[in-house]
Amino acid sequence: MVQEQFVKDFNERTGNNVQFIAAEYEPNVFLQMVRQKHLENEPEGGKRCTSCFEMRLDIVAEKALELGFDYFGSALTLSPKKNSQLINEIGLDIQKIYDVNYLPSDFKKNNGYKRSVEMCKEYDVYRQCYCGCIFAAKAQGIDLKEQNREAIKFIRNQS
């Protein structure tokens, strides 16, 4: 897997011990949830996003507990388009369900977003221009076929 090789190369270059845990890519689970809750027409940043944050943080908390981690968190707070306060509130609520703590963050503070762009260039990390949600992509006028071609090209160049 490209991600595993990237992490291995990154660790060798930097002397770090970063680990990568891949979650299943199951967009249909999200789409089912959206349909069940009738969230198809919600605006970006509305109830659909809140439900997505809840779903994703629940998955992360469950995995953190399974692996014996003390904390779980989210890189979603890096995006200038995402509500860090809301994400953190959801994480703090979810920690009550699992025996694992949520680590609140707002990575965009102190030029965090700018620094993330710099680091992605420095370490040759692929960045997409939206959160991954098909609704957000459509709202922003993003050509998903073009995004897919760019991602495939990036992956091939890594091999």
Regions found by a protein language model. Name each.
Residues 1-159:
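Nucleotide-activated chemistry modules centered on ATP-dependent adenylation/adenylyltransferase
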